[in-house]
Amino acid sequence: MKRTVISSSNAYASKRSRLDIEHDFEQYHSLNKKYYPRPITRTGANQFNNKSRAKPMEIVEKLQKKQKTSFENVSTVMHWFRNDLRLYDNVGLYKSVALFQQLRQKNAKAKLYAVYVINEDDWRAHMDSGWKLMFIMGALKNLQQSLAELHIPLLLWEFHTPKSTLSNSKEFVEFFKEKCMNVSSGTGTIITANIEYQTDELYRDIRLLENEDHRLQLKYYHDSCIVAPGLITTDRGTNYSVFTPWYKKWVLYVNNYKKSTSEICHLHIIEPLKYNETFELKPFQYSLPDEFLQYIPKSKWCLPDVSEEAALSRLKDFLGTKSSKYNNEKDMLYLGGTSGLSVYITTGRISTRLIVNQAFQSCNGQIMSKALKDNSSTQNFIKEVAWRDFYRHCMCNWPYTSMGMPYRLDTLDIKWENNPVAFEKWCTGNTGIPIVDAIMRKLLYTGYINNRSRMITASFLSKNLLIDWRWGERWFMKHLIDGDSSSNVGGWGFCSSTGIDAQPYFRVFNMDIQAKKYDPQMIFVKQWVPELISSENKRPENYPKPLVDLKHSRERALKVYKDAM
């Protein structure tokens, strides 16, 4: 373990503070061998492309087609919450209530439950951030209270084994089935759940489907995408790997299934009833272990309001006061020009269908202009929501992108420099490039940076420092409160020119131009790099020299990329 001391500004106090972080930086250099002892190879990845290996999403859909719902000897219906921690417009929860009401007609003693399953090994393997986990735990407590008003108990199950075990294992299947049997007293249970599109999660669901029997029936639903993966294809029936034509088809699809003149998406709303006659609220006994929080400065814990109502309120405020300025302000580093909804979307506290519905009402019923360049601010906001769908669609079609591999397999030949000292300086905001350092320090202190910030720092790491983009992708996942694997991998692939619909390899962000364009008065930089407050264009002695010369490092990157591609 290496101790790194970072000097940075404090966003919530006027004076400079120091932050001690004890951190193992080597964990970002590769997949965790404890969980992935045999990582996928280029050959293995190509098996998905040449169809010699079935894609997990295809397997899930194939298994589900064989299913038939039976209420015989069933006493319990249960919704399994995952990244959908909400009541309003939740497809799986809505279906669970509908199945329960059907079951009640046959069995008056039937029960309706909800469950959330904790597997700390999944969190470790997937590098979920402490910021995000704190938000999730707060959201679960709030969700439990909301469900209590409906007399629906929310159970919290913890999966532990003597050895490190992911949820896509036979041990988890046995654990899950046993837990369900305990709740239903040995009778049948119907489980509803919304699909998660990462490869590990899909293989977990495949194992469960392959092991279901008359005592356990599983029903999986598409929920996190406005348009489910696989429904948008080219005229030849293939999957899009470029966003713009996909987006135009996405808009066409959404418009074709428009619910009404005021709502473009169908929402799934459950009735506010008392679903169980007897009900007892049992507080959770789980506390987040310190290992997930030790690299976060406790004095800086300032989480957003975790409630579902807060998400809805934030959407209303954004559309009412800020969305009209979105085009001009979303990239500015010193302004809060974004919606602030990303953590609510990632954890499922708000549905993207609801977001698009509300935004649709603000743009005269047109979610896209005839010419994309003429998109209004609100239309471009909707387009950003569509990007999330796009990256999920891509992850389903190219599953190896959630297995530590780039979409463009030829970029595996790039000869990265992978300087560990330079990587640590990038992580801790000590590169000597003010805009990069300000962004990275803000990430450490708050768990959030906007999309422009992510693009700037990703370009600098992969192009100017020539460090494998996957190191940075893992760092972001471990530190972002809104970390979403498909969007994170997609964004890093774009900036490093290794991914889907990526920028050309010869496009390298100029850090000076980025700073002048998105922080022209150095308001943001001076907030997070206080060493520069009184520098008067001179580099202060207590601020590091640049790790690289921007011009020379750009030329080096072009040569290395060209040699590989």
Swiss-Prot record:
Site (Electron transfer via tryptophanyl radical) residue list: 416, 469, 492
Statement: the UniProt record of this protein carries the keyword Phosphoprotein: no
InterPro entries recorded: Crypto/Photolyase_FAD-like_sf, Crypto/Photolyase_N_sf, Cryptochr/Photolyase_FAD-bd, Cryptochrome/DNA_photolyase_1, DNA_photolyase_1_CS_C, DNA_photolyase_N, Rossmann-like_a/b/a_fold
Residue ranges of the region described as Interaction with DNA: 384-391, 451-452
Cofactor(s) needed for function: FAD; (6R)-5,10-methylene-5,6,7,8-tetrahydrofolate
Result after altering residue 463 to A: Reduces substrate binding 100-fold
Source domain of life: Eukaryota
Residue numbers binding DNA: 514
Enzyme Commission number(s) of this protein: 4.1.99.3
Any Pfam family matching the protein: FAD_binding_7
GO cellular component terms, semicolon-separated: cytoplasm; mitochondrion; nucleus
Catalytic reactions of this protein: cyclobutadipyrimidine (in DNA) = 2 pyrimidine residues (in DNA)
Assembly, per entry: Monomer.
Protein role: Involved in repair of UV radiation-induced DNA damage. Catalyzes the light-dependent monomerization (300-600 nm) of cyclobutyl pyrimidine dimers (in cis-syn configuration), which are formed between adjacent bases on the same DNA strand upon exposure to ultraviolet radiation.
Family the entry assigns: Belongs to the DNA photolyase class-1 family.
Descriptive protein name: Deoxyribodipyrimidine photo-lyase, mitochondrial
Organism, scientific name: Saccharomyces cerevisiae (strain ATCC 204508 / S288c)
Gene responsible for this protein: PHR1
